Structures are given as structure tokens and as C-alpha cells.
From Swiss-Prot:
<comment type="function">
    <text>Could be a nuclease involved in processing of the 5'-end of pre-16S rRNA.</text>
</comment>
<dbReference type="GO" id="GO:0005829">
    <property type="term" value="C:cytosol"/>
</dbReference>
<dbReference type="Pfam" id="PF03652">
    <property type="entry name" value="RuvX"/>
</dbReference>
<protein>
    <recommendedName>
        <fullName>Putative pre-16S rRNA nuclease</fullName>
        <ecNumber>3.1.-.-</ecNumber>
    </recommendedName>
</protein>
<dbReference type="GO" id="GO:0000967">
    <property type="term" value="P:rRNA 5'-end processing"/>
</dbReference>
<keyword id="KW-0963">Cytoplasm</keyword>
<dbReference type="InterPro" id="IPR005227">
    <property type="entry name" value="YqgF"/>
</dbReference>
<dbReference type="InterPro" id="IPR012337">
    <property type="entry name" value="RNaseH-like_sf"/>
</dbReference>
<dbReference type="InterPro" id="IPR006641">
    <property type="entry name" value="YqgF/RNaseH-like_dom"/>
</dbReference>
<dbReference type="InterPro" id="IPR037027">
    <property type="entry name" value="YqgF/RNaseH-like_dom_sf"/>
</dbReference>
<keyword id="KW-0690">Ribosome biogenesis</keyword>
<keyword id="KW-0378">Hydrolase</keyword>
<dbReference type="GO" id="GO:0004518">
    <property type="term" value="F:nuclease activity"/>
</dbReference>
<comment type="similarity">
    <text>Belongs to the YqgF nuclease family.</text>
</comment>
<keyword id="KW-0540">Nuclease</keyword>
Length: 133
């Protein structure tokens, strides 16, 4: 697989956690949290990040129930992924995000804003699947 830069998104209606990583190092790290309720502001900032980091692909967390079923938030995440693809022409992968926020809180050791760390957990899961046969 050629080297790719990836941005990951932990989508929420009021804030979006963002992480960055690449397929060469197979490491993900938190980047930032977008705090905005307006679609225009969210996509404006996302456009700036895409310009700055030039990712080849995006990874969006797909919220599922504990037994792996879709829920109302799943449709919102899918819509966001479709908008990323439509607005920016970016290839988008959906990744099961079950327990990513809980894992992020454990990593942080606090209940602080964990959205960017949750995005890094989601991206790391995706990167880890790339190394599996």
C-alpha cells in the first residue's frame, strides 16, 4: 500500500474530534476538536485542515450499539461521511467506534474533552487493520 496521510473524525452534532495519522508509521495522534453548531463553520474548518494536511483518505467513526447494530447516530455519521466525500472529493472509510470514547477517557485519565483522542483511537483501529493479513 502506498503511503497515505489520513484524517479521522469522531463526529458529534456539537463538536467533532479530529486525529491525523499515516499508513507508513501506522500511528494516529489527536489533532483538534471543532466546537461549532453551524455546518458552514464546521466544513470551513475541515476545509482548512484538508488544505494544511493534504490527506488522501478520511476515516469516520460509525457509532453502533454494543451488539453491533446501527442506531440513530449511525445515520448522522454516515451523512457526515457522505458530505465529506461530496464536498471535498475525499475517499472515506467508516470504522466501528464502539467504546472509543471510553478508551479515550482511560488514556486521558479524566472526563475532559476526549473527542480528538477518541478520533485517534478510531484511526488507530483502522491503521491496525491494515497490517493484518
Amino acid at each position: 500500500m502506498p503511503e497515505e496521510t489520513l484524517l479521522a473524525f469522531d463526529f458529534g452534532e456539537k463538536k467533532i474530534g479530529i486525529a491525523i495519522g499515516n499508513t507508513l508509521t501506522r500511528q494516529a495522534r489527536p489533532l483538534e476538536i471543532i466546537f461549532s453548531e453551524t455546518r458552514a463553520a464546521r466544513f470551513g474548518r475541515i476545509g482548512q485542515l484538508l488544505q494544511e494536511w493534504q490527506p488522501q483518505r478520511a476515516v469516520v467513526g460509525l457509532p453502533l450499539t454494543l451488539d453491533g447494530q446501527e442506531q440513530p447516530a449511525s445515520a448522522r455519521a454516515r451523512r457526515f461521511a457522505n458530505q465529506l466525500h461530496g464536498h471535498f472529493g475525499l475517499a472515506v472509510e467508516l470504522v466501528d467506534e464502539r467504546s472509543s470514547s471510553m478508551e479515550a477517557q482511560q488514556l486521558l485519565g479524566t472526563h475532559a474533552d476526549d473527542d480528538a483522542v477518541a478520533a485517534a483511537v478510531i484511526l488507530q483501529r483502522y491503521l491496525d487493520t491494515l497490517s493484518q493479513p
